[in-house]
Amino acid sequence: MKLSSACAIALLAAQAAGASIKHRINGFTLTEHSDPAKRELLQKYVTWDDKSLFINGERIMIFSGEFHPFRLPVKELQLDIFQKVKALGFNCVSFYVDWALVEGEPGEYRADGIFDLEPFFDAASEAGIYLLARPGPYINAESSGGGFPGWLQRVNGTLRSSDKAYLDATDNYVSHVAATIAKYQITNGGPIILYQPENEYTSGCCGVEFPDPVYMQYVEDQARNAGVVIPLINNDASASGNNAPGTGKGAVDIYGHDSYPLGFDCANPTVWPSGDLPTNFRTLHLEQSPTTPYAIVEFQGGSYDPWGGPGFAACSELLNNEFERVSYKNDFSFQIAIMNLYMIFGGTNWGNLGYPNGYTSYDYGSAVTESRNITREKYSELKLLGNFAKVSPGYLTASPGNLTTSGYADTTDLTVTPLLGNSTGSFFVVRHSDYSSEESTSYKLRLPTSASSVTIPQLGGTLTLNGRDSKIHVTDYNVSGTNIIYSTAEVFTWKKFADGKVLVLYGGAGEHHELAISTKSNVTVIEGSESGISSKQTSSSVVVGWDVSTTRRIIQVGDLKILLLDRNSAYNYWVPQLATDGTSPGFSTPEKVASSIIVKAGYLVRTAYLKGSGLYLTADFNATTSVEVIGVPSTAKNLFINGDKTSHTVDKNGIWSATVDYNAPDISLPSLKDLDWKYVDTLPEIQSSYDDSLWPAADLKQTKNTLRSLTTPTSLYSSDYGFHTGYLLYRGHFTATGNESTFAIDTQGGSAFGSSVWLNGTYLGSWTGLYANSDYNATYNLPQLQAGKTYVITVVINNMGLEENWTVGEDLMKTPRGILNFLLAGRPSSAISWKLTGNLGGEDYEDKVRGPLNEGGLYAERQGFHQPEPPSQDWKSSSPLEGLSEAGIGFYSASFDLDLPKGWDVPLFLNIGNSTTPSPYRVQVYVNGYQYAKYISNIGPQTSFPVPEGILNYRGTNWLAVTLWALDSAGGKLESLELSYTTPVLTALGEVESVDQPKYKKRKGAY
């Protein structure tokens, strides 16, 4: 929307005077920014108008995917993800930082080793990926506490508010993390271009001022004071206009919001709920933030899945390639200019970092699987759209119109949204009016072009939109000076090379397509059959029609070669930027994009670069692959693939061809059931000889938790004593009168938690857990007690993670873990004195390498036996497949060697056999000291656990530790425990170094 010069001058004058001006244009109320300091940019590298960002003065669409470094703590594999994102045609990654992992101890910021952000930033630069930094302090993210460290449960103030106690608690973290981010801003040569100071600050309740401008301004000032000068962006959880530019104190520079239109019902993956496709986002944008580019900072790229859910394979089916085609192109109809998909790669909730509603996997059904595989069709579909956006700058300057069921298509079954360009090309987004329709619809189009308004197809036949599909038809599309009057086939990419231009078009199987080109040249089929191709020459253009074929055809029109592909064939094409100075592709500037070549190469092409007379490709292969390169510079004479000189041929069209042979290596994995397993009882607390004198006493008569008042004589909330993660153990001492008959206890551990209770060594019972239960009140019968005798009640609870804190004012993150209430029949509550423990040291946690959340409070964990080389030489020989014959908790340790071949990316999985026995049990598996699996036999769903290289030593010794908690008097055992792998990938990824894996060392003060 363009304002008149007079209007613009008046607005600028008002801004200079510090006034806010509101006016109405075409029915929309516009609020212009009232804060001149906001408009005076702090840097010159990242600017914007109402259409898009500019980076270094060049207009750019930000196409981004979400990726959290803390969910993949191996730095070389972080580069792998960045390169796979770059290969999509994307230019950006958004990331969270999990405060709970770097300030587990109040006042001690530890961001080294696997928590160091700088290697992540360096990898982004190497891959040529910009970054959107989202450090919180609140992140949500299906993480424990929403990223809040557990000690915030003791803060005497409302979280995410302007209460001083909360703001003071955030200062240390934000000052450190924002300073690191500032160091890597684009202004300092780094990859970070945007900063988000809060997260989904959208909902408030309970008498708290919301939205609170004082609070938002504070968190923005925290970033600015730490040196952040790049633009600030927000992500309103819905398009509500919170903190948009012009709203006063606390306003951000660029307004953004989130959208998850299909929801999270992975149990019904074929159901697209009626009316859930957004249609009003453009209207809302013009009302809320018309002077900034339209931004969706989180758009649905997958779904979470709860304990007992259908599994992430179902989520990837729900949010599949069809969803992408319909929903993402719908976003394009709103002229989205900053688009981030949540998630592009989910990763793993290792080491207790997840929230209570989710399990170990955070695969999210995203385009890149948890094991970093890219064989989901949705990855390939994204690549088509990402590369189209990369070469279609006219999209950003077009003017979006209203969707309509008339005027463009000849059927009301279809809806068309135009984006009309002024000499920069126009774009028409076509979908079914019922977005969930699975019908195939035949149609013709009437589109305005520079030549005339034309009905398409002109050469006969009809177009087809298949069910759950959408297309972007283009008119007056500029291919380096050649005008494509229209194309019904979709554009994958185009390039101008020294010897001519190349345009790559694709369509769905069985479709008919047509394009018209402004030219006086004839059409020549230079590759493939002429069958199914027709053309017609006019005085100023040529029209070409064709039926989509699985066999590639290439036509020549003047100096333009056009590749006609079917969609599945297009999936095999890549468009790497060609580096001429070094090996890094660089960021996606117009110059770098123009330098790209086109490669047909199957699984993955990472990079391309020139060195001397050599063209070097780095690529991955999962099958014998024919490689073709289009647009090879004339200076290149030799082809190198993954460093090896590769013989090639050159055809009449200048296409280089070579073959990469794939010979799968022999992969030999150890039989885990046959390892030399050692066993130690990890619940010695129920033995009569156990001494808990070193345990912390649960003797606080008041809690610092402001959410829930005490219902016990002393606090039994674990966070009051510094325990925020993993298993909790309580020991309650009392002297019997002989009249006690029952013991009732209300425990709380979060969704799907479990608990078990013993009286001395006598098992009383368990709560085995349900997804729907975050707490449970149980009553257990007691045996006849002897008057005057001392007894100990031992309670085991697993903390499934802390609640998130989405709605400001509810303070749900403070929901306590532990014992909420108890009743020993016939006795006052004060008759029992309690002790408790969690991880050794609590907030002063022992293992600074693996972080504050990785280990819980089981005896073996407190001792550090889960780390490599525990002192197991005198332990009993027993396997988790033998298990326990009664209720209790066992600990098992064993080692094995791997010798996997170099140069191969081999995804490995720990598989726990799905239980066929009725006895419920819970399992943790530690790999070289890192907890990488949590399994609940009676809830599920996860039974297969990816463990990345770097956590596993692929060429060396590895240590497994298993905790087995039997919650039934019959005991429990693993049905099976196996290592498996999926298709090895011949990879260009470099050597993967193992993360630091400290060995067992006797812990001072361990009890």
Swiss-Prot record:
GO molecular function per UniProt: beta-galactosidase activity
- Domain of life the protein comes from: Eukaryota
Q: Which reaction does it catalyse?
A: Hydrolysis of terminal non-reducing beta-D-galactose residues in beta-D-galactosides
Q: What GO terms describe the biological role, i.e. biological process, of this protein?
A: polysaccharide catabolic process
Location in the cell reads: Secreted
- Record-annotated disulphide pairs: 205-206, 266-315
Q: Which residues are glycosylated?
A: 156, 373, 402, 422, 478, 522, 622, 739, 760, 777, 805, 914
Taking the first listed entry, what is the main subcellular location of this protein, grouped into a coarse class?
secreted
Q: Which GO terms describe its cellular component?
A: extracellular region
Q: What is its EC number?
A: 3.2.1.23
Which residue stretches belong to region Disordered? 862-881
Q: Which residues bind substrate?
A: 96, 140-142, 199, 260, 364
- Per the Swiss-Prot or TrEMBL record, the active site comprises 200, 298
Keywords (A to Z) from UniProt: Carbohydrate metabolism, Disulfide bond, Glycoprotein, Glycosidase, Hydrolase, Polysaccharide degradation, Secreted, Signal
Show which residues constitute the signal peptide. 1-18
Q: Tell me, what does this protein do in biology?
A: Cleaves beta-linked terminal galactosyl residues from gangliosides, glycoproteins, and glycosaminoglycans.
Instruction: Name the family.
Output: Belongs to the glycosyl hydrolase 35 family.
Cross-referenced PANTHER family? BETA-GALACTOSIDASE RELATED (PTHR23421)
- Name the record gives this protein: Probable beta-galactosidase A
This protein's species is: Aspergillus phoenicis (Aspergillus saitoi)
